């Protein structure tokens, strides 16, 4: 059976730390969607590891790690990230595997991404993409013109010729679309001949890999990237990523059935942040927002961009819970609220004089809602050294209990600091 860790907001909730804690007793950790547009930071014994594409389970020396078929992979970035974490002392030998069905991100995908974003910026409709080529790669996947890992590594006769043909067509299509598009086929082929041999030892049939693990009753943890509000179907479209970031993406990205899922853990930051463009009802463009940003060190792991900050939005969390079916929640970064005299939680929206308790799909309406808040007294004390949930200040527990009651899902963990030791487990 597989447990799943999913982001419940707009990403950057701190999923990596929960994955790190859970991986201490896990046999397999798998990524199911997204690419290196995501970012997790894990601190182990004072050493900081930044994960973008690779599964966070690599910090556990006994855990095998899979990049599933729903992930899109930029091979140069894959090897750069692998080298970076190995240089910090992680031995990944024989523990990292890549699905033969995963699609490849090429340099021209990344250039296309940036050119499209520049065009949108001129029309003031910028999405705020990371520029990593994720969207254009999923576009070629959907149009059935993409290149998968097996196209690159296959030893079948004429397989390299097919790879050349596919790559040539993709490059020519972009040259026709962008007259100034710079991408040389021969240099790309030379680069990928080298990468072909480097990636081969990592490649597996991910369907067989996952189902063997399920059959052998291995403990499996699936690490979702991004978050539900960035889902291509259920997020604040078009200000979303290009994959299914909810529970559906777990099934399609790994090729496992619903009955293989056990627990679904929703990770919730104690306030709300968002990177890039798009609606954000509880955003605080004031001293409170600046304080959250400063104390929370709210900068994107992947882009370095400053995150927009606001109060916790329970309309968003309730919506996310309905879709993903969380069995329990992990509240992160509660300590960021330590110095606030008052703390607010958004509980409903009002649009054109009417109360709205569900999340609107119409962004025009969403941009005009007024948020109804419940105000809580702060605890105004340092909680970073607290080791047991029961020892949290009374006002902190009231804040957490309100969240539980509103979304009707128990809180299982509370984060009170950056390290893996700063995770309080609550009896549920």
UniProtKB/Swiss-Prot annotation:
It comes from the Eukaryota. One of its GO terms (cellular component) is cytoplasm. GO terms for molecular function: adenylosuccinate synthase activity; GTP binding; magnesium ion binding. Substrate binds at residues 301-307. GTP binds at residues 11-17, 39-41, 307, 333-335, 415-417. InterPro entries: Adenylosuccin_syn_GTP-bd (IPR018220), Adenylosuccin_syn_Lys_AS (IPR033128), Adenylosuccinate_synth_dom1 (IPR042109), Adenylosuccinate_synth_dom2 (IPR042110), Adenylosuccinate_synth_dom3 (IPR042111), Adenylosuccinate_synthetase (IPR001114), P-loop_NTPase (IPR027417). Pathway: Purine metabolism; AMP biosynthesis via de novo pathway; AMP from IMP: step 1/2. Keywords: Cytoplasm, GTP-binding, Ligase, Magnesium, Metal-binding, Nucleotide-binding, Purine biosynthesis. The keyword Cytoplasm applies. It catalyses: IMP + L-aspartate + GTP = N(6)-(1,2-dicarboxyethyl)-AMP + GDP + phosphate + 2 H(+). Homodimer. This is Adenylosuccinate synthetase. It comes from Komagataella phaffii (strain GS115 / ATCC 20864) (Yeast).
